[in-house]
Amino acid sequence: MKRVVITVVELALTVVASAKVENGGIDAKMMEQLRKGYTASPEQKAVKNALASTPINTLATNGENLAMCDTHFSHRVKTSGITNQKSSGRCWLFTGLNVLRAKMINKHNLGTMEFSQNYCSFYDLLEKSNLFLQAIIDTHNLPLEDRKVDWLLHNPIGDGGQFTGVSNLVMKYGIVPKEVMPETYQSNNTRQMRTILSLKLREYALALRATDKKLLATKKVEMLTEIYRILVECLGVPPTEFEWTLRDRSGKALSTERYTPKSFYEKFIGEDLEGNYIMVMNDPTREYGKVYEIEYDRHVYDGENWLYINLPIERIKEMAIASIKDNTAMYFSCDVGKYLNRDKGTLDLANFDYESLFRTSFPMSKRERVQTFASGSSHAMTLIAVDLTAEGAPRKWMVENSWGAQSGYKGNLIITDEWFNEYMFRLVVERKYVPEDILKMLNQKPIMLPAWDPMFAPEE
């Protein structure tokens, strides 16, 4: 067992952090004051009684905003069909594949089709397992209490992610149609599988930390062999070759050929996802015009961390509008749980009036919400439409979601421009829609941020 050495500074900080302040607790006098502060007026009794048996959002629903929203959009990307991630955290994968799906449908005049999310999920979990194990090897000499090691052990594997995962996986492994590797129960319901994998990876982490350095590489392969077996049993064997028939919208067969996953991607998409797409973000806690890189912000160890250009929201809107006008969908992420009316399928600051219900205010700005972990990117969807005024200003936006066709507005969510300002965080846009002055920002040396930065939780 390694001897733990505590420095004088660390000890002093521990003492300060644990020191109790006199009168810092809730004593009888304070409790009496709190009780007196609550006056059971008829209004307060009514609210208390209602909250005892009714969801908060039901009571906070803004009655003046109940009318169905306008579903007209001046510009909309042509899409077909709605996907469903079910009980999994794979929104990032569904969204990225939906961006590619729209391209294939429009390019080849196809009906509804999907790429296999399960195929990509298999390699995503295998690559994340390798990323974790190799990171444990790379931090072999650090103490278990080190912040980086601590973060790794808290986050061994999950099925959340972002566009980096799509670009890494598709460029390395290709894609296949959904019918070639369909979903399984475990791919649709990932919680228990994630628990099993996490438990195994944490066990392996301790074993690797106790292994001689000369044996680490061999040991890792043995561990990944076991992980591979578990993934096969949960998700199936990924195909290395398959036969597929291309059909038009009417169902007429156009061609039947044999493909590998990579040759299929090259024939029907063929883009360099790692070089042709730019990720921009709106993070008001950081300086605009700077490029940021997040440690371990990738799904593949031998891939590259994604780079984010931090921009004012209006610059991001310019690129989004240009892309939609050119019939090109985008990867979009936001804090979807805020002011979401699931029945109407709207994201609108006027959906709920929490202030009136609780007779208080919630004045924090977007910057303050991010700083205090009150908000951040939580879900990815496909940005497909914008409604512009005669002057070209956006009124509202629409995203294609991955919660099934019965969710929201025909499987989509309609976003007011005011909500977009407050809760939109990231957009992945093709390079050709990015102004030259923004592209030049990529020449900067990126500012490296730690993996636990509050802005960069995986989208689920």
Model-assigned labels for residue ranges:
Residues 117-246:
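Papain-like cysteine protease catalytic cores
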Residues 93, 119-122, 168, 177-180, ...:
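Structural recognition of the beta-strand scaffold that forms the well-ordered cores
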Residues 21-81:
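N-terminal regions that are enriched for targeting/export leaders
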Residues 21-22, 215-460:
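Active-site signature of cysteine proteases
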Residues 77-89, 151-157, 302-310, 319-320, ...:
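Second-shell loop/turn segments in exported
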Residues 87, 95-96, 100, 162-171, ...:
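Stable alpha-helical elements in mature extracytoplasmic
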Residues 69-139:
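Post-signal peptide N-terminal segment of secreted/secretory-pathway proteins
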Residues 1-22:
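Bacterial Sec-dependent N-terminal signal peptides
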